[in-house]
Amino acid sequence: SAASDVYKRQLLDIDAAISLISEFEEPTFAILKHNNACGIASRPTVLDAWKAALEADPVSAFGGVLITNRPIDKAVAEEVNKIFFEVVIAPDYSVDALEVLTQKKNRIILIQKENAIKPKQFRSLLNGVLVQDRDLYQERPDELRQVTEKGVTDEEIEDLLFANKIVKHSKSNAIVLAKNKQLCASGVGQTSRVDALRQAVEKARSFGFDLKGAVMASDAFFPFPDCVEIAHEAGIDTVIQPGGSMRDNLSVDYCNANGIAMVMTGIRHFKH
């Protein structure tokens, strides 16, 4: 039935939302549609995180699944209540926040309890079931390998890891553009990594983001320098990617010639 189809879709988005938010320790708010983040930001307060997350794509936020890793109070609830959404998830809610959020019908309001993410994933495939390890690896700053002449600052490392967490939970091929711990835009589910980047750049510009000083994260390596060329033209000068292509040197050489900093993780996140 149509109702059961909606419920199934919500469950899939809820699962994706919980997996994504588990990556972040700072106050963070995320908005998801069809298992991908269309908005996410980390800020000192939940209210500021919500506002920054919504800025990334207020159009796609319509009908989305919202999640935060901090309790929601009345002030946050009043802001969230201004848009149409299907599901909101938080560790807790104040009484007056619930009074606000329950004003509109057919909303699903969930409390996320502390529980470990299961290490295995199961997926039906042809006449059987595919069992695989869940991608739970989290890169650390000291594991990033600088491969360009230009280095990265501590602030840029924070943005690089922020973007890398998002791209890890985005459908491949995926590119994420972020700045000051705010998603500017992403290109997801593309058959070409170049198309994913072009999609992200166009989307960021359409919502008024200045990409100068933004970082780019890719969920897999660059076999050619075309992605760093497009990123450079857009104003991006800091990149994180797994590396591992036989032609890594082509992208590294372009970065060195154009003042771009690049780090490699050695870990490919390839969500299907």
Describe each region flagged by the PLM.
Residues 2-7:
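Short, small-residue-biased leader/transition segments that mark boundaries at the very start
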Residues 31-33, 67-69, 112, 178-179:
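Short beta-strand segments
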Residues 151-170:
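Short, basic/aromatic recognition patches
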Residues 51, 110-157:
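Long, charged amphipathic helices and adjacent flexible linkers at domain junctions
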